[in-house]
UniProtKB/Swiss-Prot annotation:
It comes from the Bacteria. Pfam families: Ribosomal_L35p (PF01632). PANTHER family: 54S RIBOSOMAL PROTEIN BL35M (PTHR33343), LARGE RIBOSOMAL SUBUNIT PROTEIN BL35M (PTHR33343:SF1). This is Large ribosomal subunit protein bL35.
Length: 68
């Protein structure tokens, strides 16, 4: 059976945490920061865990992720 390919877009955008959750960057910080409050911008820092349903789809794109 041939090897399965990992989707390049998925490996660049997502990481799998030690507990198996899919971690992603916060959405909503590409442009338009002027109209957002400072607290909104502050809360959008860092990464967040993806929902379980969406995480299952992303894990299917990365067949060799260790905690997939």
């Amino acid at each position: 059976m041939p090897k399965l390919k990992t989707k390049s877009s998925a490996k660049k955008r997502f990481k799998i945490s030690a507990t198996g959750k899919v971690m992603m960057a916060q959405a909503g910080k590409r442009h338009g920061m002027i109209k957002r409050t400072n607290s909104q911008i502050r809360k959008l820092r860092g990464t967040t865990a993806m929902s379980k349903q969406d995480g299952k789809i992303v894990k299917s794109y990365m067949p060799y992720s260790l905690r997939g």
